[in-house]
From Swiss-Prot:
This is Ribosomal RNA dihydrouridine synthase. InterPro entries: BaiN-like, BaiN-like_dom, BaiN-like_dom_sf, FAD/NAD-bd_sf. PANTHER family: OS12G0638800 PROTEIN. Belongs to the BaiN/RdsA family. RdsA subfamily.
Length: 400
């Protein structure tokens, strides 16, 4: 049986980065993945350009039952540290919006960078390999793969969550945690589009493809100001993806379709200047024409001129456009979700090393645990930061 200092399961962002760091420090590392190639989810991210971090990373941008858990790792390996690595590899990047950093060229550059870093550390890759069983004894862990048995002193689970099953997502990491007696919190899809109840969906389907700036608010008071997109299945766009992580089934969300306009002042000014102008054309100054026309067809916008708009109807209109209350039917689920909420309970792990408190030598990094970031590079930064924290402990084990 071949033995390694550390075996890392999952050749995604966290797994590759942790492997590279430990390998370059002299640890003998085996990196296992069930896919044909490493970094499959990285390649799909950011529209193929990989939103690899965010300039404004802070603990408040992460959801967890223990909101303090992420603080240590994020402080010890920051976005600036990862940007330094990207720069060292000569990868050109740009800020798109809200601090989101993307490769100028392709997400493949980030994958190539991580593979290169792994090769510098003499990391052994074992792709297309399924882990059939994991056992622990006094010397460490023994893994039964399809066709071979390997052993290690340290075992790192970097298998991610359940989002995007088409890219190989599975509950493997949760099963390992449960096998060793660790608590796993309920999971659900995060950063995911909303589906709508049939009557509302049928009313809005003709708007598929229309995007508008918005402010969207969850019942718990969480607010995001980003674009909203109407789709054939419901509502999407950055604002919806963000708020979906804070939404619970049965709850409403409030949507302001005119976040940059004081609608009452605007209507009063336009009424004084252009009393005979239609309300529809007035609103089309700030809203997509297709949206205005559809809302008028649905009776949400009166078919009147500005001088005919009475106070009661104006107040109802303002409420419709700035506090549109929608009760989603659900979400599109893991198939299109960018992340998985919940996972391995962080109370089971050391926030400094990511090691399981009950099981020395067993670590969890990245999305598999109950830490979920906002849209916009935050989840990649958690992958880098948690991987770095874990790697430092793998390295320290060698020196001790």
């Amino acid at each position: 049986m071949e033995r390694f200092d550390a075996i890392i399961i999952g050749a995604g962002a966290a797994g590759m980065f942790c492997s590279a760091l430990a390998g370059q420090a002299g640890r003998r590392v085996l990196l296992i993945d069930n896919g044909k190639k490493p970094g499959r989810k990285i390649l799909m991210s950011g529209g193929g350009r990989c939103n690899f971090t965010n300039l404004y990373v802070e603990p408040g941008a992460y959801l967890s039952q223990n909101p303090h858990f992420c603080k240590s790792a994020l402080a010890r390996f920051t976005q600036w540290d990862f940007i330094d690595l990207v720069n060292k590899h000569g990868i050109a990047w740009h800020e798109k919006t809200l601090g989101q950093l993307f490769c100028d060229d392709s997400a493949q550059q980030i994958v190539d960078m991580l593979v290169d870093e792994c090769e510098k550390g003499n990391v052994t890759f074992r792709l297309r390999s399924e882990v059939l069983s994991v056992a622990k004894d006094e010397t460490g862990f023994t893994l039964d793969l399809n066709g071979m048995t390997v052993g290690c002193e340290k075992l790192v689970i970097a298998t991610g969550g359940l989002s995007m099953p088409g890219l190989g997502a599975s509950p493997f990491g949760y099963k390992i945690a449960e096998q060793f007696g660790l608590n796993v919190l309920p999971t659900r899809a995060g950063l995911v589009p909303f589906t709508l109840h049939k009557p509302l969906l049928e009313e809005l389907q003709v708007l598929a493809g229309v995007a508008v700036p918005s402010v969207i608010t969850a019942e718990n008071g969480t607010v995001f100001r980003e674009n909203l997109l109407f789709t054939h299945r419901g509502l999407s766009g950055p604002a919806v993806l963000q708020i979906s992580s804070y939404w619970q089934p049965g709850e409403f969300v409030s949507i302001n379709l005119l976040p940059d306009v004081d609608l009452e002042t605007f209507l009063n000014e336009q009424r004084n200047a252009h009393p005979n102008q239609s309300l529809k054309n007035t609103l089309a100054v700030h809203l997509p024409k297709r949206l205005v026309e559809r809302l008028q067809q649905l009776g949400q916008i009166p078919d009147v001129s500005l001088k005919q708009l009475n106070v009661r109807d104006q107040q109802a209109l303002i409420s419709t456009l700035t506090d549109w209350r929608v009760q989603p039917n659900g979400t599109e689920g893991y198939r299109t979700a960018e992340v998985t909420l919940g996972g391995v309970d962080t109370n089971e792990l050391s926030s400094r090393t990511m090691e399981a408190r009950k099981v020395p030598g067993l670590y969890f990094i990245g999305e598999v645990m109950d830490v979920t970031g906002w849209l916009g590079g935050y989840n990649f930064q958690w992958a880098w930061s948690s991987a770095w924290a874990c790697a430092q402990d793998l390295i320290a084990a060698k020196s001790s």
